[in-house]
UniProtKB/Swiss-Prot annotation:
Bilayer-crossing regions: 8-28, 50-70, 87-107, 129-149
Subunit structure: The transporter is composed of YjjB and YjjP.
Organism: Escherichia coli O157:H7 (strain EC4115 / EHEC)
Protein name per its UniProtKB record: Probable succinate transporter subunit YjjB
Stored Pfam families: ThrE_2 (PF12821)
GO biological process: succinate transport
Amino acid sequence: MGVIEFLLALAQDMILAAIPAVGFAMVFNVPVRALRWCALLGSIGHGSRMILMTSGLNIEWSTFMASMLGGTIGIQWSRWYLAHPKVFTVAAVIPMFPGISAYTAMISAVKISQLGYSEPLMITLLTNFLTASSIVGALSIGLSIPGLWLYRKRPRV
């Protein structure tokens, strides 16, 4: 993949990630003045995850690092705009949730219950369930670590 193709794919990924970030921000009743920042943070998070995955990291670690970046930026923006950090961060990580792997695991579980046990279905179920669980864990831990670092009162050492 050339540089131009990568930059176009990155721009497309970031623009498409901004749409669900704004949508969920509107569902969560985020103030109108913060919607553009939710979109930008969703784009930054999803774009950084794509960059990390393109550079060779797996999706779980890329999601963890991207959510840490989003959490750190969200905390800084909350100080600038006098809002709670969750205003920016929660809606911004929604585009990184593992919808496809969770859906595939659920469909595999339904097929196992309808058709009976088969090894390929069980492998599909477990692989996708563990992937989805790892990504959700990476998102939650990655969002909480910047708050633990940046709001700490005692010395770090």
